């Protein structure tokens, strides 16, 4: 059975953001605006996405 994945794209800059939010973007594997990564849909990943919801776009 295939695991569910979620596509996350960074839409805003991390400059001037809280250090914890910048670290969360790094933890998600995002490096720059427009960068998209495909991650496993787990509760921990969802929590990280919720923390920086205003800087990312999510596609299921």
Swiss-Prot record:
PROSITE patterns: RIBOSOMAL_L30. The keyword Electron transport does not apply. One of its GO terms (cellular component) is cytosolic large ribosomal subunit. Keywords: Ribonucleoprotein, Ribosomal protein. Pfam families: Ribosomal_L30. GO terms for biological process: translation. Belongs to the universal ribosomal protein uL30 family. This is Large ribosomal subunit protein uL30. The gene is rpmD.
